[in-house]
């Protein structure tokens, strides 16, 4: 029986202040960018325990979207039901203070229509062995 994970891919952009955060000021620190999204994280973690899930989602139709797909493939996630489209991924921008607490964030949600289209077109095929 196969495991199917359905959901969003996000790109998380996280900024970490090196000293006490000043909301109206400039803050020196570090900024990282990582692949995120709860469903993407779940699919990757399931694959890390060698269960080879199928992931149904969408990614942006650019190099970042392709990078997400390639990383999932390296983890042995089945990616044939990931659609490349404009606005396929969400973005989460978070700012952390020097103690690691979130002090600000903005989230851009992706378009969910591509996932609906995948399920409409391939749902029977996807779930027959799930």
What are these regions (language model features)?
Residues 1-56, 63-67:
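Glycine-rich phosphate/adenosyl-contacting loop at the front of the ribokinase-like
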């Amino acid at each position: 029986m196969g495991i199917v994970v359905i959901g969003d891919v996000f790109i998380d952009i996280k900024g970490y202040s090196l000293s006490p955060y000043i909301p109206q000021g400039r803050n020196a620190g570090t900024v990282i960018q990582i692949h995120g999204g709860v469903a993407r994280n779940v699919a990757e973690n399931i694959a890390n325990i060698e269960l080879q899930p199928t992931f149904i989602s969408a990614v942006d139709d650019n190099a970042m979207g392709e990078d997400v797909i390639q990383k999932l493939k390296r983890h042995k996630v089945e990616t044939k039901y990931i659609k490349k489209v404009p606005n396929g991924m969400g973005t989460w921008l978070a700012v952390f203070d020097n103690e690691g607490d979130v002090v600000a964030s903005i989230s851009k949600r992706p378009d969910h229509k591509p996932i609906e289209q995948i399920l409409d077109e391939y749902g029977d095929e996807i779930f027959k062995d799930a």
